[in-house]
């Protein structure tokens, strides 16, 4: 990646090899550096801070509750700013390695109630009610690399790249950009213990995708949020910005989504296509409610993306079809032929909260709400 492209990025100018001499310093066996990660008041951005532990935790319940300045994260007033972090999932730290950990956290107000952007609490309650149906989720997370000035990485500064066509799953310096970051992120997710299942270059140049899952219940949200944290954190080291904006470039360019693949035990068994069709029928009656749940601005972000063009459905209409990427719900050709499997909800935006998406889907297809 050329220095010219990154010349405006202060992070890219730092000599990363200097850090290695300090990361290689030995620590006492029982010392653990823990990075607490949480969702801020935007509902789409992440924050983190570190603390030292004198023991090696085996579960999130062993970790201490911590606090932070919620007024600086759009989650509290300055006059009463203490907001609390409750650990919910532990991952291995690919940056510090060893016994060091990353900790996904829930956020709570001073009075013990969840913050407005803590969507995990109610999602977990719903997931527990549906546990007997063994719901599995897989999410295809699309994102776009930007220069430090907010321009898509590798795009001409005073023009546009060639039309879409050669970039999807492309190979070659004139077709894909920043594969180094993609590979670093992929490996870091695997090391951390995130159930990442693959990655590929997307339709728009500088756009990529990674897939998480299949995961059972709430774990899809934990894994996807931590995978997003790693994406932003690794991009930071390269001096590049990763955006989850669902339509980063207006015009004749694909947007970015978080296509969500869903199945229950009944759908995965022989004859499960009937259960898939029943779920699709239920979803057809709750389209507006799902649109509100599928991006952090209650549908405003998705309105820029779900236009009926560029492999999307219309935000105003529900549709379903076999192998049709222009529908709200796609049933893969192989699933239709096998008579069992899963369906794909193509409506969630790239910056969606996966906890909100999972909760909405389970309420509709399992709880009949």
UniProtKB/Swiss-Prot annotation:
Record bears the keyword Magnesium: no
Gene Ontology biological process terms from the UniProt entry: glutamate catabolic process; glutamine biosynthetic process; synapse assembly
Protein name: Glutamine synthetase 2 cytoplasmic
MF (Gene Ontology): ATP binding; glutamine synthetase activity
The protein's assembly and partners: Homooctamer.
Name of encoding gene: Gs2
Assigned protein family: Belongs to the glutamine synthetase family.
Intracellular or extracellular location(s): Cytoplasm
Domain GS beta-grasp per the UniProt entry, residue ranges: 32-112
InterPro entries noted in UniProt: Gln_synt_N (IPR008147), Gln_synt_N_sf (IPR036651), Gln_synth/guanido_kin_cat_dom (IPR014746), Gln_synth_cat_dom (IPR008146), Gln_synth_gly_rich_site (IPR027303), Gln_synth_N_conserv_site (IPR027302), Glutamine_Synthetase (IPR050292)
Gene Ontology cellular component list: cytoplasm
Catalysed reactions, semicolon-separated: L-glutamate + NH4(+) + ATP = L-glutamine + ADP + phosphate + H(+)
Domain GS catalytic: 119-369
EC number(s) recorded for this UniProt protein: 6.3.1.2
Alphabetized SUPFAM superfamilies for the sequence: Glutamine synthetase, N-terminal domain (SSF54368), Glutamine synthetase/guanido kinase (SSF55931)
């Amino acid at each position: 990646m050329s220095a010219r492209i990154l010349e405006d990025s202060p992070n890219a100018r730092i000599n990363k090899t200097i850090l290695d001499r300090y990361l290689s310093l030995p620590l006492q066996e029982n010392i653990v550096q823990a990075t607490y990660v949480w969702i801020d008041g935007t509902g789409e951005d992440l924050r983190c801070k570190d603390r030292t532990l004198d023991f090696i935790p085996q579960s999130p319940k062993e970790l201490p509750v911590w606090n932070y300045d919620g007024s600086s994260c759009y989650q509290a007033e300055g006059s009463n700013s203490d907001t609390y972090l409750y650990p919910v999932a532990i991952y291995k730290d690919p940056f510090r390695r060893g016994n060091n950990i990353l900790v996904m956290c829930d956020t709570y107000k001073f009075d013990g109630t969840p913050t407005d952007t803590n969507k995990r609490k109610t999602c977990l309650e719903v997931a527990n009610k549906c546990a007997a149906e063994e719901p599995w989720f897989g999410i295809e997370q699309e994102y776009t690399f930007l220069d430090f000035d907010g321009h898509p990485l590798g795009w001409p500064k005073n023009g546009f790249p060639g039309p879409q066509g050669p970039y999807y799953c492309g190979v070659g310096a004139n077709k894909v950009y920043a594969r180094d970051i993609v590979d670093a992120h992929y490996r870091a997710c695997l090391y951390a213990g995130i159930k990442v299942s693959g990655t590929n270059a997307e339709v728009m140049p500088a756009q990529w995708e990674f897939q998480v899952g299949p995961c059972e219940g709430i774990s899809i949200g934990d894994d996807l949020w931590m995978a997003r944290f790693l994406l932003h954190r690794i991009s930071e080291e390269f001096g590049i910005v990763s955006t989850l904006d669902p339509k980063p470039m207006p015009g004749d360019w694909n947007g970015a989504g978080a296509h969500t693949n869903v199945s229950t035990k009944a759908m995965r068994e022989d004859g499960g296509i009937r259960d898939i069709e029943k779920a699709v029928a239920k979803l057809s009656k709750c389209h507006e409610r799902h649109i509100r749940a599928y991006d952090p601005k209650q549908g405003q972000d998705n309105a820029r993306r779900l236009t009926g063009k560029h492999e999307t459905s219309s935000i105003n209409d529900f549709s379903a079809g076999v192998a049709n990427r222009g529908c709200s719900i796609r049933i893969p050709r192989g699933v239709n032929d096998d008579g069992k499997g899963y369906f794909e909800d193509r409506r969630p935006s790239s910056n969606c909260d996966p906890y909100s998406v999972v909760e909405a889907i389970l309420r509709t297809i399992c709880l009949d709400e």
